[in-house]
Amino acid sequence: MKQGKNKRNNTQNLKEYIQQLAQTGIKELTDIVFPPACPVCGGVLGFEKGRRRQICPDCDNRLEYIGEPRCMKCGKPLKKTDTQQFCYDCTVKRHFYERGVAVFAYTDGIKQSIYQFKYHDKREYAAFYGRQAAQQCGALIEKWDIDLVLPVPMYAAKQRKRGYNQAELIARELSKNLNLRSEER
């Protein structure tokens, strides 16, 4: 009886392995025929150290990542000389959330990328944004002891028109990269 059960498990494991291998092979073949584009400039992404780049080197050098010091409420960058923990906006305006964090300064390249992502069906950009959020803010998210990533819902009519909720796609990628639970509403 035990031998039959092991044989079934081995067969199931082999099936899963072959399916995963086929999916990986199809993805790699698709990447060769239709190489992914840089989520900032739209150029073809090359390889670095045998792996496909997430972003082209020129755009990577131009992106402004937000590090410390940052506002303890909304995550906006603060000047290195600031002794305050909050930006001006957060001292004069009440927010309906506890904490926020931003990965990038909202400069031209990112503005255009976000616009393409939201309004021109560039769903594939979610992987880049999710990975960057995990890399740049993962330690902070871990420090906050977050156990669930919940995307901001969209108005139903907007989501029907667009076909997807970009916050949901990023939340899925972020949770995958940080091994957190994610729920979609």
Residue ranges and their predicted role:
Residues 1-183:
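Glycine-rich phosphate/pyrophosphate-handling loop used in enzymes and phosphotransfer proteins
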